[in-house]
Amino acid sequence: MAVIGAPKGHNRYRDPKTFQMTPALYRVRKPFFWKNFAGFFLVSSIPLGVYLYTWNVLSKDEFADIPIPPISDEELAKLKKEYESK
């Protein structure tokens, strides 16, 4: 029975010595380039939109309404000493 196709271990879309793309692989991939690019654009725009929306919402947040508890001078000196020792 005759074997149809490339011999076992031979890849007709890659050069066997350099493993670079052959003109056949360029021809095979050409019709799918713009469809793949559009799909990539749509899929990547979703997380990018979520990220930009989150950044926009969080940048408007003000913390002026959160009261800062008073700290005693002894506690402040203790924290400074701890910070400077690191």
Swiss-Prot record:
Protein name according to UniProt:
Cytochrome c oxidase assembly factor 3, mitochondrial
The keyword NAD appears for this protein: no
Indicate the principal place this protein occupies in or around the cell: mitochondrion
Which InterPro entries does the record match to this protein?
Coa3 (IPR041752)
Q: Where in the cell is it found?
A: Mitochondrion inner membrane
Q: Which domain of life is it from?
A: Eukaryota
Where are its TM segments located?
A: 33-55
Tell me the keywords, alphabetical order. Answer: Membrane, Mitochondrion, Mitochondrion inner membrane, Transmembrane, Transmembrane helix
The segments annotated as topological domain Mitochondrial intermembrane are 56-86
Q: Give the UniProt entry's GO cellular component terms.
A: mitochondrial inner membrane
Mitochondrial matrix topological segments: 1-32
Function comment: Required for assembly of cytochrome c oxidase (complex IV).
What does the sequence similarity comment in the record state about its family?
Belongs to the COA3 family.
